[in-house]
Amino acid sequence: MTIKLAIDCMGGDHGVGVTIPAAIHFLAVHEDVEMLLVGQPDAIAAQLKRLHATANPRVHVVPASEVVSMDDPVEVALRKKKDSSMRVAINQLKEGAAQACVSAGNTGALMAVSRYVLKTLDGIDRPAIATAIPNEKGAGTTVLDLGANADCEPEHLLQFAQMASAMVSVVEQKPRPTVGLLNIGEEVIKGNEVVKQAGELLRASDLNFFGNVEGNDIFKGTTDIVVCDGFVGNVALKSTEGLAKMIGEMLRQEFSRSWFTKLLAVVALPVLTRFKRRVDHRRYNGAALLGLRGLVIKSHGSADAYAFEWAIKRAYDAAANGVIARIAQAFESHHDAAGAAPVSTSAPAADAA
């Protein structure tokens, strides 16, 4: 089966200089993929010429005259820039021309446009942002929400867990992934009322609920999935990224102190290389906007070509494993079993940067 991926070529801090090289390199190692490169034709053509990919039959240019900048308010992206590369790329999903969309654009705009164009799946009140964070076990812990919903009701946290369980079960081939609820302690009496009530809902559900987990459990890999509201999740994600950069910089400084430490660095290079690979945040780039009637993957805005290619891989894996259909099926099963309609609430604009 051929998988078609729509790439927002103009999004992010670096635009076509990153997105197109990543897409072309991914094509070279995946023969079952076609790329829909969405953006300004002249800019795309210049990159394709530089990469000697102009005549590639699996590359299709989809014109879009506008660009959503990283500073554009949601209202501008949603109401004024209707021919932006972001909007046109998402339209490819709605029209069935692509199985997934990848964008490094403004998170708030991407969530708002995606929700407006694609709508949410039945039974889901609010979409959530989910990604994997490195852990000791090497597989990565899937954490959500990472910034789409700063304030949540208990039912929303349950839905986040249901969506993530459906995704992880097919992408990572884990039939019953474990779910942890992020809290300030493992005891059921701890946490605010929302977290306590969410814990009760999770314990009563058919999910493989482990119980409350703390922040350090994300990195231990205690559970396959960790659920929290978007405010807590975004702080955890940004703290993780900052810590990884700090450790890398401190190692560089220490190994540069003298000729002896520089010699030690050479001796330790194989170990340091393996360590860097395990904690390299670029390998975990690509967050899924779960809960929509289409597969949208958000790349970090500052991603380089290597990191953006990992976001493309996330989209490819999710599309190949039918994640959207699996989530829809899961919610149909959950609500058939519950015999109750989902809570209806309005969703705020995404808060993540």
UniProtKB/Swiss-Prot annotation:
<comment type="function">
    <text>Catalyzes the reversible formation of acyl-phosphate (acyl-PO(4)) from acyl-[acyl-carrier-protein] (acyl-ACP). This enzyme utilizes acyl-ACP as fatty acyl donor, but not acyl-CoA.</text>
</comment>
<keyword id="KW-0443">Lipid metabolism</keyword>
<dbReference type="GO" id="GO:0006633">
    <property type="term" value="P:fatty acid biosynthetic process"/>
</dbReference>
<dbReference type="InterPro" id="IPR003664">
    <property type="entry name" value="FA_synthesis"/>
</dbReference>
<keyword id="KW-0963">Cytoplasm</keyword>
<keyword id="KW-1208">Phospholipid metabolism</keyword>
<comment type="subunit">
    <text>Homodimer. Probably interacts with PlsY.</text>
</comment>
<comment type="similarity">
    <text>Belongs to the PlsX family.</text>
</comment>
<keyword id="KW-0808">Transferase</keyword>
<comment type="pathway">
    <text>Lipid metabolism; phospholipid metabolism.</text>
</comment>
<dbReference type="GO" id="GO:0005737">
    <property type="term" value="C:cytoplasm"/>
</dbReference>
<protein>
    <recommendedName>
        <fullName>Phosphate acyltransferase</fullName>
        <ecNumber>2.3.1.274</ecNumber>
    </recommendedName>
</protein>
<dbReference type="GO" id="GO:0043811">
    <property type="term" value="F:phosphate:acyl-[acyl carrier protein] acyltransferase activity"/>
</dbReference>
<dbReference type="Pfam" id="PF02504">
    <property type="entry name" value="FA_synthesis"/>
</dbReference>
<dbReference type="GO" id="GO:0008654">
    <property type="term" value="P:phospholipid biosynthetic process"/>
</dbReference>
<dbReference type="InterPro" id="IPR012281">
    <property type="entry name" value="Phospholipid_synth_PlsX-like"/>
</dbReference>
<keyword id="KW-0444">Lipid biosynthesis</keyword>
<keyword id="KW-0594">Phospholipid biosynthesis</keyword>
